[in-house]
């Protein structure tokens, strides 16, 4: 156990940063390697300040670059793989998503075998399980239910294939004769300071007289705070490195939620921003069934125009379903196998996130002020 090291891919991202901040507190960790395509200068500076007893090495490169991955994995004890393209709206080209999310994961697994890395933790997503229909209700779902996303949309499809590859790699023989142990974590919708979807919703509202656009008023979900998802990764690596706990965790996937109240996406955005005068759109909205079929018609238009023009619909059947389903999950299995319990309460998570939303509001005010001067 002495002098181990950890590689975190996607370490410049929303979740990856939080994992790194928790990792530096781990005992006997000699080095953290943070990998991403590029790191913002301010994040590089923050990472440099985290260094105390633990060396922190910044690696910039492509997840599809095999020699780069092999170098990154050399002498590493644990890989936490969070790097991926997240695109629920279909903005990014399908081939790019499949390459990064699926091929990149496969190349990283192969690099682990060559470098004899014994532990691999994959950040999956709730979307590999669905929802497949807004009419299907899943409340307090669990890992024993045979749920699988059937949408052809590239993001959930790529994450599903990548997760299958990671779990199938459990038990592979490493170059040094050891064994690779893997597991996957499926977090709910993640919110918190720096959250890209929440940030987009808040900034859009600030430019729309403080009115929050409806993104999912018919949904019931259990969002999870980013700090708790990061904590689950720490517990997963501890479990896979513990000879007593590892057998029950190897090759398994876990839903990661916390004690955030079950609610709609719209309500979450409102709760986190109402202190600053933001409000929900009170205008009449279309019935869900009609929105679904309009989404279908927009898909048809996009398909018909595709030979001459790339039309990106504002929504489609998949996004309508994703944003308006009753789809909640329990973290009991993670509690049992990983000794997971949320590090942050709902009240703590809410307070931290609201403070961050306040910083977005202040920045918006400063921007308006500078434009009028």
Swiss-Prot record:
GO terms for molecular function: 3-beta-hydroxy-Delta5-steroid dehydrogenase (NAD+) activity; 3-beta-hydroxysteroid 3-dehydrogenase (NADP+) activity; 5-alpha-androstane-3-beta,17-beta-diol dehydrogenase (NADP+) activity; oxidoreductase activity, acting on the CH-OH group of donors, NAD or NADP as acceptor; steroid Delta-isomerase activity. Pathway: Steroid hormone biosynthesis; Steroid metabolism. InterPro entries: 3Beta_OHSteriod_DH/Estase, Lipid_A_modif_metabolic_enz, NAD(P)-bd_dom_sf. It catalyses: a 3beta-hydroxy-Delta(5)-steroid + NAD(+) = a 3-oxo-Delta(5)-steroid + NADH + H(+); pregnenolone + NAD(+) = pregn-5-ene-3,20-dione + NADH + H(+); 3beta-hydroxyandrost-5-en-17-one + NAD(+) = androst-5-ene-3,17-dione + NADH + H(+); androst-5-en-3beta,17beta-diol + NAD(+) = 17beta-hydroxy-androst-5-en-3-one + NADH + H(+). SUPFAM superfamilies: NAD(P)-binding Rossmann-fold domains (SSF51735). A bifunctional enzyme responsible for the oxidation and isomerization of 3beta-hydroxy-Delta(5)-steroid precursors to 3-oxo-Delta(4)-steroids, an essential step in steroid hormone biosynthesis. Specifically catalyzes the conversion of pregnenolone to progesterone, 17alpha-hydroxypregnenolone to 17alpha-hydroxyprogesterone, dehydroepiandrosterone (DHEA) to 4-androstenedione and androstenediol to testosterone. Additionally, catalyzes the interconversion between 3beta-hydroxy and 3-oxo-5alpha-androstane steroids controlling the bioavalability of the active forms. This is 3 beta-hydroxysteroid dehydrogenase/Delta 5-->4-isomerase type 1.
């Amino acid at each position: 156990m002495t002098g181990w090291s950890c590689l975190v891919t996607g370490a410049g991202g929303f979740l990856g940063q939080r994992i790194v901040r928790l990792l530096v507190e781990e005992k006997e960790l000699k080095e953290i390697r943070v990998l991403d395509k590029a790191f913002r200068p301010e994040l590089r500076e923050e990472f440099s300040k985290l260094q105390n007893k633990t060396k922190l090495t910044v690696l910039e490169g492509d997840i599809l670059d095999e020699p780069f991955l092999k170098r990154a994995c050399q002498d590493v004890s644990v890989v936490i793989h969070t790097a991926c393209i997240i695109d629920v709206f279909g903005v990014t080209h399908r081939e790019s998503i499949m390459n990064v999310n699926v091929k990149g994961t496969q190349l990283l697994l192969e690099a682990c075998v060559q470098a004899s890395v014994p532990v691999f933790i994959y950040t999956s997503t709730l979307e590999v399980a669905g929802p497949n229909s807004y009419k299907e209700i899943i409340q307090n779902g669990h890992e024993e239910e045979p749920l699988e996303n059937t949408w052809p949309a590239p993001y959930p499809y790529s994450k599903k294939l990548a997760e299958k590859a990671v779990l199938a790699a459990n038990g592979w023989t490493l170059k040094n004769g050891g064994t690779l142990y893997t597991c996957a974590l499926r977090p709910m919708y993640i919110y918190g300071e720096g959250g890209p979807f929440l940030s987009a919703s808040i900034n859009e509202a600030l430019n729309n007289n403080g009115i929050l656009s409806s993104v999912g008023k018919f949904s019931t979900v259990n969002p999870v705070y980013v700090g708790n998802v990061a904590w689950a990764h720490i517990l997963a690596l501890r479990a896979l490195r513990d000879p007593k706990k590892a057998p029950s965790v190897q090759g398994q996937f876990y839903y990661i939620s916390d004690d955030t109240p079950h609610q709609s996406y719209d309500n979450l955005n409102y709760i986190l921003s109402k202190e600053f005068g933001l409000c929900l759109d009170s205008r009449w909205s279309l019935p869900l069934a009609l929105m679904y079929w309009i989404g279908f018609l927009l898909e048809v238009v996009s398909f018909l125009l595709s030979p001459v023009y790339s039309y990106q619909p504002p929504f489609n059947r998949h996004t309508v379903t994703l944003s308006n389903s009753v789809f909640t999950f329990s973290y009991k299995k993670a509690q049992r196998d990983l000794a997971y319990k949320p590090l942050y309460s709902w009240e703590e998570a809410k307070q931290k996130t609201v403070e961050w939303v306040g910083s977005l509001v202040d920045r918006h005010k400063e921007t308006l002020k500078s434009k009028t001067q």
